[in-house]
Design a protein with these regions (language model features):
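PEST-like low-complexity, intrinsically disordered acidic/proline/serine-rich tracts
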Residues: 20-165
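Absolute protein N-terminus
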Residues: 1, 19-20
Length: 165
């Protein structure tokens, strides 16, 4: 009888683990990335010859093909760390918080978490960037779609990077 109870408890525990929703939280490594240089060139192609190389250089510097992302989601905060950059701590629920990038540029940053998606938004007077981290249904793949908008750009810059566990 005791063995039967242990078996039932073991089966229920296994089913409970199998039924858990996949989580955004964890460490993810790049498996595929769009051609970001081509996306940048398409974004700046209609700019005049003076502004185009300046915009291309700045966009190239600020939009690398990240190799690793670490995400931590809790009731108290959302933390995103890209490659070796400083982690970004944000309040949950879409509330904005001040954040200063490593180069000193200041932003208001926000994080909105849904079951299978994290939307991270950076805004300042120069424009805004939105990172949408979308989890695949099986929880094995995370796709980052970045969109950069600015009044200085003729069109938004958009590209995607795919990560695996």
């Amino acid at each position: 009888m005791r063995a039967a109870r242990l078996f039932v408890v073991s089966v229920l525990a296994a089913l409970s683990l199998a039924a858990q929703e996949p989580s955004l939280s964890g460490t993810w490594s790049q498996t595929k990335a769009d051609d970001i240089a081509a996306a940048i060139n398409a974004t700046v192609k209609d700019m005049n010859f003076i502004k185009r190389p300046i915009a291309r250089g700045r966009l190239t510097k600020l939009n690398p093909a990240y190799k690793k992302v670490m995400i931590t989601v809790s009731d108290k905060e959302v933390v995103v760390k890209l490659d070796e950059r400083t982690p970004i701590h944000m309040p949950p629920g879409g509330k904005t918080a001040p954040w200063t990038r490593e180069d000193g540029e200041k932003f208001m940053v926000a994080a909105q978490v849904a079951k299978d998606q994290l939307v991270q938004t950076f805004k300042n007077e120069d424009g805004e960037r939105t990172n949408v981290f979308k989890l695949s249904p099986d929880g094995r793949t995370l796709t980052l779609t970045a969109t950069v908008k600015s009044p200085q750009l003729p069109r938004p810059l958009t590209y995607s990077i795919t990560f695996g566990r």
